[in-house]
Amino acid sequence: MDIIETAKLEEHLENQPSDPTNTYTRPTEPVEEENKNGNGKPKSLSSGLRKGTKKYPDYIQIAMPTESRNKFPLEWWKTGIAFIYAVFNLVLTTVMITVVHERVPPKELSPPLPDKFFDYIDRVKWAFSVSEINGIILVGLWITQWLFLRYKSIVGRRFCFIIGTLYLYRCITMYVTTLPVPGMHFQCAPKLNGDSQAKVQRILRLISGGGLSITGSHILCGDFLFSGHTVTLTLTYLFIKEYSPRHFWWYHLICWLLSAAGIICILVAHEHYTVDVIIAYYITTRLFWWYHSMANEKNLKVSLQTNFLSRAWWFPIFYFFEKNVQGSIPCCFSWPLSWPPGCFKSSCKKYSRVQKIGEDNEKST
């Protein structure tokens, strides 16, 4: 009886029609047809995966998501434009100082204006040298820190744009209003009275000496509103703190002390009116905070009716520099120069996962 039942079962299975829903058949549709139907592989598949699928047709192609674009593109060419902008305004400042110097009234005819700080604090001769030395130290620390930043191109263009804009403001303020010297100790260079060649020599002397008194290049008067030394001391500290790790509190404290002491020494030396320092500090900090708030917040990069920051005259320049930067820049450091150079690095053959598994299967068979 068992033999008869087995024979009937086999006969029943042979006569039963095959159900296509219970089997899997690999589609034989060509790749061109798949691409037309929208089922083809995306263009972003790596070349290794394409080669692997051709060599091993038994593997099923899986569409991988495309890589997101770089959130922090370097764009060094934009940094170059910002650098030219900063250099132009710095040179323009020296030209403006030379022009304004000819309009400064003699201290015998126009004595220094009253200043409350000067009323209570007597002048200390060496204080201004301390201020300039502190500024040189802060600039040196900032340049060294900037060289080791991973995204130095983005940070560099921000620094160049901000300092260039600040010195552009300084050119305007010193030109529209000429203040008398803050103290009777000032020894201003003689006026040239239209000697263009001598003015060019003074401009070159200012540029070569960095406009510092300790280098003997700061011999002109009239650049009192607002203080360029305060701009440098404040801005370098702000950038040092912003683009360094938060747990470097000791580093931030040292830089803050250098900046604060330098600003106080400007007033102690009676080289600038108190209002010069206050205005310089206010404009520098506002411009730095406004720019970085707009750069770090995506909604502030759009010119909207409710975004009042976008009404600044420099917003189109800001958008040009920052439109491709997505979010806040992470505090990352790297060596300024990669070693060994790319031409000395040995090229290694890269395998995709499909190729590696396929070759392992061939070896096992």
From Swiss-Prot:
Predominant location of this chain?
membrane
UniProt superkingdom: Eukaryota
Polar residues: bias regions? 15-26
User: Which pathway does this chain act in?
Assistant: Sphingolipid metabolism
Q: Sorted alphabetically, which Pfam families does this protein's record hold?
A: PAP2_C (PF14360)
Query: What post-translational modification information does the record give?
Result: Palmitoylated on Cys-331, Cys-332, Cys-343 and Cys-348; which plays an important role in plasma membrane localization.
Q: How does it sit in the membrane?
A: Multi-pass membrane protein
Would the keyword Transmembrane helix be found if you checked this record's keyword annotation?
yes
Per the UniProt entry, the Enzyme Commission number(s) are 2.7.8.27
Q: What is this protein called?
A: Phosphatidylcholine:ceramide cholinephosphotransferase 2
